[in-house]
């Protein structure tokens, strides 16, 4: 699969699939060890991961985000951690949803103030309303995860759908959580436009 590398910053990088869902995956690097988050495999991905350091593990933040997590973990010779709890390496995990149909944790890297969300927050066009830089998942806009995530103060936010927010992430984060409900009409319109744009002419 063709992917485009993105979200380059001093603690890692990402890669994104050019499609309606804008699936985005990430590699986080700490002390020469590389943790891979919700990966979709693609051209050059394994090589880029190995070039960044020694593979340490593959982390799946959402129960239905199987993607290529298991296959890539096997290729890299590391463990596949599915919706982990507590802590792992330098990361802590925050429960976002825990229902029969939706089990999701967010990855919080306190030492670097990096937040990674699988589905709860995103930047893909069908997530956003108007000029939003970051948005709550369409199905969570009525009850956004303020209680779960609101105390965090991220400097970088990486998403499972869409490119990350690498500048002034805190402002985008607070706005997304506080305005999600009133921006529902705009989000619906944006999602329709995004869907139409991907349809063959």
Could you tell me what each predicted segment is?
Residues 84-90, 96-99:
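An acidic, phosphate/nucleotide-engaging active-site surface
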Residues 6-7, 28, 85-89, 107:
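Short acidic-hydrophobic surface loop/beta-edge motif
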Residues 21-24, 43-48, 67-69, 101-104, ...:
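A generic local structural motif
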């Amino acid at each position: 699969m063709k992917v485009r590398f993105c979200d380059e910053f001093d603690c890692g990088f990402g890669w994104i699939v050019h499609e309606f869902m804008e699936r985005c995956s990430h590699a986080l690097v700490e002390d020469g060890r590389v943790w891979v988050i919700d990966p979709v495999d693609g051209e050059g991905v394994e090589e880029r991961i190995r070039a960044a350091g020694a593979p340490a593990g593959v982390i799946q933040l959402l129960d239905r985000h199987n993607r290529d997590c298991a296959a890539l973990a096997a290729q890299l010779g590391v463990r596949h951690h599915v919706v982990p709890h507590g802590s792992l390496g330098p990361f802590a995990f925050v429960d976002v949803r825990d229902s029969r149909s939706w089990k999701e944790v967010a990855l919080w890297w306190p030492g670097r103030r990096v937040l990674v969300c699988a589905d709860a927050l995103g930047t893909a066009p069908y997530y956003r309303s108007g000029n939003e830089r970051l948005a709550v998942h369409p199905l969570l806009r009525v009850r956004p995860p303020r209680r779960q995530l609101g105390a965090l103060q991220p400097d970088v936010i990486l998403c499972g759908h869409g490119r990350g927010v690498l500048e002034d992430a805190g402002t985008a984060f607070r706005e997304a959580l506080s305005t999600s409900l009133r921006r529902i009409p705009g989000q619906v319109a944006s999602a329709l436009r995004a869907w139409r744009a991907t349809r063959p002419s």
